[in-house]
Amino acid sequence: MKIFGTDGVRGKAGVKLTPMFVMRLGIAAGLYFKKHSQTNKILIGKDTRKSGYMVENALVSALTSIGYNVIQIGPMPTPAIAFLTEDMRCDAGIMISASHNPFEDNGIKFFNSYGYKLKEEEEKAIEEIFHDEGLLHSSYKVGESVGSAKRIDDVIGRYIVHLKHSFPKHLNLQSLRIVLDTANGAAYKVAPVVFSELGADVLVINDEPNGCNINEQCGALHPNQLSQEVKKYRADLGFAFDGDADRLVVVDNLGNIVHGDKLLGVLGVYQKSKNALSSQAIVATNMSNLALKEYLKSQDLELKHCAIGDKFVSECMRLNKANFGGEQSGHIIFSDYAKTGDGLVCALQVSALVLESKQVSSVALNPFELYPQNLVNLNVQKKPPLESLKGYSALLKELDQLEIRHLIRYSGTENKLRILLEAKDEKLLESKMQELKEFFEGHLC
């Protein structure tokens, strides 16, 4: 049975993520990390979901039962876990979060000792241990060999210092008015501190988590409130994070939501202008707009494509010796400062770009026009191979003949089919999307 999805393990708390399941997974992961253990320490952080307490305690019980010492640091962004795992010399890091999903869901993401998400072969190795009853039950420690757990509440300072070091030393934010939407999630403490200490005039919204309101009509998936607040406050910029703050949505001074591909393009060129790129390659996923590739080419930069998911972006960056890349959804990686997508690092770089451009953000962040794209997330009841659906191949052939770029795939974390179409003719795009929706609703819903 496959346990891992595209971004760790995710499911409804108490249904898939039961205490017994989490303990078993914790033991399996711990035994895998033990093979290369250097310090016998594992770091655990979480977002603000109520079920995080249950998942955290199950993991602590599992890991200490096989002899690991556990450090618990409470609510922190996912990229903070990646950074602190390496910074605190831990064998591994664990983030308890379902990212942008509703509060009823939760998830578990693993990081190696260098702060990188696990490769697929590493996840498969953990799955094999998970299903090995004999190994699991013979691994418990007794007496002095049992591990210990301790909670450290002040590591947030390390991460704040790290974030501030990512911001250009010759700049400050004193001339910017910024609205932050922390999604009642993991960034609710750290984001206001960082921007305030760098001098910005800050308004914070959705920073009162109660365990059940994470991502609720707020944050990166619902930026309309942020857009209204930016206009009302007459702010220069607005930043919306998702529940675990590895993702960023930007709103300009006019209240417009900045498309993720425009962000990738303008940030890539900004990094080039500072001689901060390690190569001429910038990495994006197969969902990226063709206009991004054309814009980067005009700036003597090459776009490299990869599969969807920030761990695939990270891997492609390493293969191409690139230090910048991301997804149009807002997972953007500056690998000089973060091993995974970091919404706060990205927000600081966007702020620096706007400052140095000496333009309002609605101009500075609008470097090119996009080709029309239509993205639909369709709820499905089953996930058979798409190639097995009668008429599917003929549909794709027709799209190719009409020069409509297409990307159709199941979500790795939800029961959804994602359909992306791109073409120069917007009316044709809408017509074909309706046809596709009706086709898949008839087969999958």
UniProtKB/Swiss-Prot annotation:
It is an enzyme of class 5 (isomerase). The active site is at residue 99. Activated by phosphorylation. Transmembrane segments: none annotated. Binds 1 Mg(2+) ion per subunit. GO terms for cellular component: cytosol. Keywords: Isomerase, Magnesium, Metal-binding, Phosphoprotein. The modification Phosphoserine is found at residue 99. Its EC number is 5.4.2.10. One of its GO terms (biological process) is UDP-N-acetylglucosamine biosynthetic process. One of its GO terms (molecular function) is phosphomannomutase activity. It comes from the Bacteria. Its cofactor is Mg(2+). The keyword Aminoacyl-tRNA synthetase does not apply. Mg(2+) binds at residues 99, 242, 244, 246. Catalyzes the conversion of glucosamine-6-phosphate to glucosamine-1-phosphate. NCBIfam families: glmM. Belongs to the phosphohexose mutase family. HAMAP family: GlmM_B. PANTHER family: PHOSPHOGLUCOMUTASE (ALPHA-D-GLUCOSE-1,6-BISPHOSPHATE-DEPENDENT), PHOSPHOHEXOSE MUTASE. This is Phosphoglucosamine mutase. It comes from Helicobacter pylori (strain HPAG1).
